């Protein structure tokens, strides 16, 4: 469903202390801490819950839609009290070169835009070009978690991952919520309103965890 843009959303979000620019992001990246990045944070349901649950971890979200960020700010009353959550209003594809090498311990890709048309394949966040970007900014043994309701996008991700010898698949499933509750793929899984919607519809959720070797 298309989100109706809020007028001057980009100006309103800049007043929130958790919204930072790329330059400020570099100063927030503490090499002594565990740093996690979510690309395409949406309304922030996932990263917000992660930051609350894990105060010792620094969470960084990138979201290019100002209206979506504003909805997150308005919805999350405790947002500004969190000192370990930072949101960058930008497009990862345009700013990835600004990130230092080996600066993140973990990357999350949650319900990314599937870009279903073949001519848009390079825009998919699991395309080879993006995987190479992730490899550069991940620390040694850094982990990537990718979760999607879109089966075609998941199959594409598997194809891209299998084409690279330097990637090791740790675990994956085509039906996350059919697994036993003790399964590692469900450990610390955050169910957002978006994901719950698909669970209610009995739609399978795909998930893969992998790293570079």
Swiss-Prot record:
EC number: 2.1.1.33
Pathway field: tRNA modification; N(7)-methylguanine-tRNA biosynthesis
Annotated S-adenosyl-L-methionine binding sites: 38, 63, 91, 113
Binding site for substrate: 117, 149, 192-195
Recorded GO MF terms: tRNA (guanine(46)-N7)-methyltransferase activity
Reactions that this protein is recorded to catalyse: guanosine(46) in tRNA + S-adenosyl-L-methionine = N(7)-methylguanosine(46) in tRNA + S-adenosyl-L-homocysteine
Record bears the keyword Transferase: yes
Leading EC class: transferase
InterPro entries assigned to the protein according to its UniProt record, in alphabetical order: SAM-dependent_MTases_sf, tRNA_(Gua-N-7)_MeTrfase_Trmb, tRNA_methyltr_TrmB_bact
GO-annotated cellular components: tRNA methyltransferase complex
Family designation: Belongs to the class I-like SAM-binding methyltransferase superfamily. TrmB family.
Name of protein: tRNA (guanine-N(7)-)-methyltransferase
Protein encoded by which gene: trmB
């Amino acid at each position: 469903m298309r989100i109706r843009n809020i007028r001057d959303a980009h100006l309103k979000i800049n007043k929130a202390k958790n919204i930072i620019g790329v330059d400020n992001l570099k100063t927030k990246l503490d090499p002594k801490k565990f740093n996690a990045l979510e690309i395409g944070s949406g309304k922030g349901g996932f990263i917000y819950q992660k930051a609350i649950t894990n105060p010792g971890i620094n969470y960084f979200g990138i979201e290019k839609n100002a209206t979506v960020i504003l909805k997150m700010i308005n919805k999350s009353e405790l947002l500004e009290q969190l000192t370990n959550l930072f949101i960058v209003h930008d497009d990862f594809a345009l700013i990835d070169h600004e990130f230092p090498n080996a600066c993140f311990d973990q990357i999350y890709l949650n319900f990314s835009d599937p870009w279903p048309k073949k001519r848009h394949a390079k825009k998919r966040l699991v395309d080879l070009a993006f995987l190479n970007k992730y490899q550069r900014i991940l620390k040694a043994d850094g982990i990537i978690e990718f979760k999607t309701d879109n089966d075609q996008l998941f199959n594409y991700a598997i194809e891209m991952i299998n084409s690279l010898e330097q990637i090791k698949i740790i675990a994956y499933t085509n039906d996350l919520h059919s697994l036993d509750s003790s399964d590692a793929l469900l450990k610390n899984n955050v169910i957002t309103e978006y994901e719950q919607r698909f669970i209610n519809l009995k739609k399978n959720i795909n998930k893969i965890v992998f790293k570079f070797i």
